[in-house]
Curated annotation (Swiss-Prot):
Ranges in a coiled coil: none
Pfam family membership, one: p450
Lineage: Eukaryota, Fungi, Dikarya, Ascomycota, Pezizomycotina
Full protein name: Pyrichalasin C-7 hydroxylase
Cofactors, names only: heme
Species this protein is from: Pyricularia grisea
């Protein structure tokens, strides 16, 4: 128990801390506003309320693209997290300089800290060891994991859909269960990926982080947020971590033993637990390794599931593409069966009509309307003289770029052959995992999503299995669902239902 003198000291410290922080915070906001004064500000013309910046960002950024960005002019707009000051949207002409900039100048990690309050809720973070495991080890070992992804898709769907009869299931739930299972095959390996307790963790980790961040903002104003460090600010995230540690502990011990014995047993492990532990200068403690797996679930499960749901909805909404795509798939399935039921990357990549359809769906239905989101850690002057002040959160308008009629003619029309035609001009470009200054779904440059090739195979296998082995349809009286918007995020309504049954 604190004595009365200690209580008085604590109270005085809290009050003084509040006064100092409030003064600093107010002055910082004013200084930030002055620092951005040279950048045009975009508002909603009517009803310019904070709520509209949470739910209508996509339409406002499209207007900003037409008014400013297509002419190479940046603009600023309100940040839904008002304490961070206005966010800046940059035209693509600055993308090359941002791609080449070091993290000490423009940082995604700092952006995440600011937006999600990671240090206050003790959230998992990405490490360099994990980044290299995803970027190098997964891609290098893709041939070893490819057929496991296909097998897990098959098993999950057999568990979900009865042999006879039809079920009705929310599209988001179906997609999330498939992606959680198949991604987990690579994250934690075959022995844990089918465990329902792990699947629950893989799905709930993102919700726990968002709830922790929002709860912290609801309970503490910026001036008092430092107090959260002395409390358990995200109980749900803590519970998720504790359960994950319990489940991963045997795998962690098994891989630690293999590394110490150096007996060659490590060659049997094809998962990010081992690949992360096998890096030099890495924290191999159970807590650290578990946090890396939780970070991967945050980065991969819900975004990929939202993408899969969108692709399925576009498939049902555009039956005019069914015959030719199914013919292409069936040709490759015949080759797959002829090879003893083994996929190769080449066989999957040969399905170019399928690839084009999926890429068009992702262009039309992004999981976010922004990309390359960064926090400016220092003031920087670009080559044309434009100054971006330190402390600025900025990003690039991927959705608006993908709807620029000069780049994508008739952009509001769904054209499943769009990228097939583009690939005829350049066979190495415009495939699903391709990144460029005009195809920005995966980010850009060396900072592009390192797991995009894994996600591509996961999505293709799920899509192929669903449309060749099952009958899918929208429930009677319904069609393609509408969108949910939140801040810069977009996705098809995850609660919208699908009817599914085993094909006869």
């Amino acid at each position: 128990m604190l004595n009365s003198a200690a209580c008085i000291v604590l109270a005085i410290t809290a009050v003084l801390g509040r006064m100092i922080y409030t003064h600093f915070y107010s002055n910082t906001c004013a200084a930030m506003k002055r620092a951005l004064a040279h950048i045009p500000e975009l508002h909603f013309e009517e009803d310019d309320t904070p709520e509209r910046y949470r739910t209508e960002t996509r339409s406002l950024v499209r207007k900003g693209y037409e008014r400013y960005l297509q002419y190479g002019i940046p603009f600023q707009m309100r940040n839904p997290v008002s304490e961070l000051g206005n966010q800046v949207v940059l035209p693509v002409k600055y993308l090359e300089e941002v791609k080449r900039a070091p993290r000490s100048l423009y940082s995604f990690e700092a952006f995440s800290e600011k937006v999600f309050l990671l240090k206050y809720i003790d959230a998992p973070r990405q490490t360099d060891a994990l980044l290299y495991a995803v970027k190098l080890d997964i891609n290098k070992n893709m041939d070893h994991i490819l057929n496991g992804l296909w097998d897990e898709t098959q098993v999950l769907l057999k568990e979900t859909v009865p042999v006879t009869g039809q079920i009705t299931i929310p599209g988001g739930e179906l997609a999330c269960n498939i992606i959680a299972r198949t991604m987990s095959y690579v994250l934690v390996g075959p022995s844990l990926c089918r465990n329902p307790e792990w699947t629950k963790i893989a799905i709930e980790a993102t919700f726990a982080l968002v709830a922790g961040t929002q709860g912290l903002r609801d309970r503490y104003s910026p001036g008092w947020r430092w107090l959260a460090r002395f409390q358990r600010s995200s109980e749900k995230l803590g519970e998720v971590r504790e359960k994950a540690m319990e489940l991963i502990k045997p795998l962690h011990e098994e891989r630690m033993k293999a590394l110490k014995d150096d007996s060659g047993q490590f060659r049997n492990f094809y998962d990010t637990i081992f690949w992360t532990m096998n890096k030099r200068k890495v924290d191999r403690s159970l807590r650290a390794i578990v946090d890396q797996q939780l970070f991967l679930t945050l980065a991969s499960i819900h975004t990929t599931a939202g993408t899969l749901q969108s692709i399925l909805c576009d498939w049902l909404a555009h039956p005019e593409y069914h015959d030719e795509i199914l013919a292409e798939i069936n040709e490759r399935l015949a080759a797959f069966k002829g090879a003893g039921g083994k996929w190769t990357q080449q066989e999957v990549n040969e399905m170019k009509k399928l690839d084009s359809f999926m890429k068009e769906s992702t262009r039309v239905n992004p999981v976010g309307c922004m990309t390359v989101q960064r926090y400016a850690q220092r003031t920087h002057t670009f080559s044309d003289g434009f100054v971006l002040p330190a402390g600025t959160i900025f990003q690039f308008p991927s959705d608006a770029v993908h709807h620029d009629p000069k780049l994508f003619p008739d952009p509001e029309k769904f054209d499943g052959h769009r990228f097939l035609r583009l690939r005829e001009k350049d066979a190495n470009a415009y495939h699903y995992g391709y990144v460029s200054d005009t195809t920005l779904n995966w980010g850009a440059g060396t900072h592009a999503c390192p797991g995009r090739f894994l996600a591509t195979y996961v999505l293709k296998f799920a899509f192929i299995a669903l449309i060749t082995q099952y009958d899918l349809s929208f429930p009677e009286g319904t069609g393609k669902p509408g969108y949910f918007y939140f801040d810069n995020s977009v996705r098809i309504d995850p609660t919208a239902k699908l009817d599914i049954k085993k094909s006869s």
